[in-house]
Swiss-Prot record:
GO cellular component, one term: cytoplasm
Location of this chain's protein in the cell: Cytoplasm
EC number: 3.1.-.-
Protein's organism: Chelativorans sp. (strain BNC1)
Co-factor remark: Binds 1 zinc ion.
GO molecular function: metalloendopeptidase activity; RNA endonuclease activity; zinc ion binding
Record keywords: Cytoplasm, Endonuclease, Hydrolase, Metal-binding, Nuclease, Ribosome biogenesis, rRNA processing, Zinc
Residues that coordinate or bind Zn(2+): H126, H130, H136
Example GO biological process: rRNA processing
Source species, domain of life: Bacteria
Protein name, entry field: Endoribonuclease YbeY
Protein's gene: ybeY
Cofactor: Zn(2+)
Family label: Belongs to the endoribonuclease YbeY family.
Length: 163
């Protein structure tokens, strides 16, 4: 497992590459920082916080999905918002955790004719929006969240992921 830490302007990002044929660490770090910075600029989330990102495989994603969502299958991205808690002044609060499954992300990118990096960026944005309180349980929520994703990705010169 490869672990590290990076900082976007407002977020300290801890990342871990557990398993999978993920791109190089510097590529992942840059991608996550860009996605988080763009998404944070469009949400009402905290001005400063820490965030953890786990890059893993479908086996671990399946286990996490089963344990926390009751769905015994792998998925592309999972988000785990951190509970609101008191933190000392000047200490960034933990915003939450995002987990990504390599095989599913890779397969979806190929099936949808997207670059792996663009699809991964979309999923990091999607996961971040969940941490910020957005959801897609109803049609109205889904439309609002998808539109916000489009706007964030457009700011990163990435096309509409739903087109």
């Amino acid at each position: 497992m490869v672990e590290g830490e990076a900082s976007s302007p407002a977020f300290t990002i801890d990342y871990a590459v557990a398993t999978g044929d993920w791109p190089a660490e510097d590529v992942l770090r840059g991608l996550v920082e860009r996605a988080v910075t763009a998404a944070a600029a469009r949400t009402d989330g905290p001005l400063q916080a820490s965030l953890s990102v786990l890059f893993t495989d479908d086996a671990e994603m399946r286990a996490l999905n089963a344990r926390f969502r009751g769905k015994d299958k792998p998925t592309n991205v999972l988000s785990f918002p951190a509970p609101d808690s008191m933190v000392p002044p000047g200490t960034p609060r933990h915003f939450g955790d995002i987990a990504l499954g390599y095989e599913t992300v890779s397969r979806e990118a190929k099936e949808e004719g997207k670059s792996f990096e663009h699809h991964l960026t979309h999923l990091v944005v999607h996961g971040f929006l969940h941490l910020a309180g957005h959801d897609h349980e109803t049609e109205v929520e889904a439309e609002e969240m998808e539109q916000l994703e489009r706007e964030i990705l457009q700011s990163l010169a990435i096309g509409d992921p739903y087109a």
